[in-house]
Amino acid sequence: MIKPMLAHKFDINRVDYTQPDGYYIQPKLDGVRCLFTANGAYSRNNKKFMNLKHIEMALKPFFEQQPDVVLDGELYNHGLRYDFEKIISLVRKQKPTEEDRRNAQHLIQFHVYDYFSMDSHYEKYQTRMNNLVNSDIYCASVRYVPSYKVHKHEEALNMHHDAFLSNGYEGSILRDGSTLYKHGRSYGLMKFKDFSDAEATIVGYEIGQGKRTGTLGKFLMMDDDGNKFGCPPGKGFTYKDMANMLKNIDNYIGQRATFTYFQRTNAGSYRHPLFKTLRNYE
């Protein structure tokens, strides 16, 4: 089973901006993690994606030359950054129709930010980044996620992170240039963003009131610690979407879901929780 490298939350005590290989910052994409191989594309939990034929064809020449390489990135489209469910609906198709494939070709891109192989396990990120920059794999459906070298935290936070947020990205990823690719969480890869993601189980719902009559008002959710809370649909969901959610509410009850929140209180409750998507695509 292929496992990607995962980020820890940012910890300033683990950063040394003076180390020789440097630190690099990237925009954090709010997409679907994807590992692309010569045999197809897989989720972080090893579920094969079946609706990415256009990307498979674009990468075919690369994998014919380097069949042992695994490209690490995100299925994403910045134009759909407020419509995550649209990406999910196309990515999760296990028996895509021709229309599904056409829509995926038009909307789904693979944004590459790292790679690994048997030969590259001893390559530092700085080397891997330079190899990606000079690769000829990029096209309309395969994009490179740029990295910017930073020399101090104020530069990373005030210049790049703020710019990423202003441009609609969900945060930043800080990479240690000396880090080898690790399968699992690594402090060589740290994330900082204003909102956090978490998972919980949908246990109930409330109907919308006022102008949202006839739609889903909020899901009632329970996290793994037994905390119950209300969670309205977040950005990107239209009245039609929320009406369909209410109509098909039985398909949601009991499901695991991803939600975003701003902070946790001392009592453990979530501030501004918003439903993002069902966690059934990985």
Protein language model features and the residues they cover:
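Phosphate-interacting basic helix/loop segments used at nucleotide- and nucleic-acid interfaces
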Residues: 7-25, 145-168, 202
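Classical nucleotidyltransferase
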Residues: 26, 32-36, 40-73, 181-282
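Short, structured patches in soluble enzyme cores that scaffold and shape functional sites
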Residues: 75, 112-117, 146-149, 176-178, ...
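Secondary-structure boundary elements
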Residues: 133-141, 165-170, 227
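Amphipathic alpha-helical
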Residues: 1, 147-196
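Covalent nucleotidyltransferase
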Residues: 15-140, 281
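Short, well-ordered loop/turn elements at secondary-structure boundaries
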Residues: 18-21, 29-30, 106-107, 166-169, ...
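Short, Gly/Pro- and small/polar-rich lid/capping loops
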Residues: 4
